[in-house]
Regions:
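N-terminal accessory regions of nucleic-acid-interacting proteins
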Residues: 1-34, 38
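Short active-site oxyanion
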Residues: 10, 61, 81-86
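Catalytic-core regions built around general acid/base machinery
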Residues: 22-25, 73-83
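A residue-level signal for conserved active-site and pocket-lining positions in enzyme catalytic cores
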Residues: 37, 53, 87, 111
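Short, glycine/acidic-enriched loop or turn micro-motifs at the edges of active sites
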Residues: 40, 68
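A short alpha/beta connector and helix-capping loop motif
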Residues: 44-60
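Metal-dependent phosphoesterase core characteristic of DEDDh/y 3'-5' exonuclease domains
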Residues: 55-58, 93-112
């Protein structure tokens, strides 16, 4: 599948219901892979935490703000799905932060 040369703006996700809807849509579409990156404030805080999650499919980009989201379990469900490859770049710190902050396990990882 060729990637589009048109890049629509990323969709901002900041509620539990938006997150659940997005994860349900992604899981239902049965993608081969999703790309994930996290941003943390560990350089500027005594105990760092995930401040932003960037998630991309072949057709759309999403910015997930975990602070206002009361329940991140839908994201954990995606991470646990073994049939979907999760693409990270230098995944070590992302995986540490995801485990530390949300207690989620990530399966089927491709680390660039």
């Amino acid at each position: 599948m060729a990637l589009s040369k048109e890049f629509p703006p990323a969709t901002y996700i900041d509620t539990t219901s938006q997150l659940r809807t997005l994860m349900d849509e992604i899981l239902a579409s049965e993608p081969q892979s999703v790309a994930i990156d996290t941003e943390s404030n560990s350089m500027y805080a005594y105990r760092g935490q995930v401040c932003l999650i960037q998630l991309s499919t072949r057709t759309a980009d999403y910015i997930i703000d975990p602070f206002p989201i009361e329940n991140m379990q839908a994201f954990g469900d995606l991470l646990a799905e073994k049939r979907i490859e999760k693409i990270f770049h230098a995944a070590d710190y992302d995986l540490i932060c995801i485990k530390r902050d949300f207690d989620f396990e990530v399966h089927n990882i491709f680390d660039t």
